[in-house]
Amino acid sequence: MKTKPHFRSTAFVLGMLLVLFPVFVAAQSSGRVDFTARVSPTGGRPEPVRQMTFYLLSKSLDDIRTEALQFEPPPDLDKFVDGLKVSPQMKEWMKKRHSVRLVGGDFTKSLTPDDIVDVPEFFDAYMKRNSAFKGVGFPEPRYKEKDKTANPEKYKAQKEEYIAAIRKFIGAVPESVQGLDADMEDLNPFESWQHLVFAQRQQLEKKTIELAQQRYLAAQADTDLDGHGAFAGVAPSTYWISMIGTEAISGDVRLHWDVPVTVRPGETARVELSNLNATKPNTTADNSTH
């Protein structure tokens, strides 16, 4: 009779051990990440990143963004150019330069005499810009329209001579190209291209956030007023401390982080997030300058 309570007591203890042992093992095998985030404005002192959400991801945010590109690829510039109502020569020029920007000093400086003579839109704008200089050094045509049918060989030779003279004049007087872009405003497709690029970037960032949260999120934590945060009970592995869809701002500085950290069983990894290990805001597929 005295052995039964002892047996029951032993069975109870064994039962509790069986219940608690997995919890104990899990606690011993998991790790922890403590981090502090601070931003230093230019010429200023470090400031804590207060009450912002940080994410512990099982994949680098940059790699996740690359994965998202499979779902939201950048717009095709050549396809965009094919849809424009411009000359074939203009389309060829845009594809060769990989640019649809037809305004600004950099654009006009990039134009060669061959570009201006060979692309009808450039030639028309150039001639319109320089028509006032005829008689003061600018070439004048010798060919006559009546010769186009009456004497086509003479017409062709004199027109080619005139074009060659203009080509030579452009090379000798490069400043004559200045202001050409003012007559290209109605043809400039740059703004339409920018809209496409901006829309793709928005969709790409949306897909990146979706993948990060649905496939690769291990933990998340908010920083306190001192910029401290922690991820507890994390399985041993390599992770990345990241910000998703937000930036840490201080003065003229805007940062986010995608910092790797290794979590070991039963240990606490400590990470200092600062300007030194931050990355610049994403500028993936920066086609807006084309």
Model-derived regions, located:
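Charged interaction patches that mediate protein-protein contacts
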Residues: M1, G15, D286-H290
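Bacterial N-terminal signal peptides
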Residues: A11-V23
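Bacterial N-terminal signal peptides that target proteins for export
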Residues: K2-V13
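Long luminal/extracellular ectodomains of secretory-pathway precursor proteins
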Residues: Q28-H290
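N-terminal targeting/docking segments
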Residues: K2, V25-A26
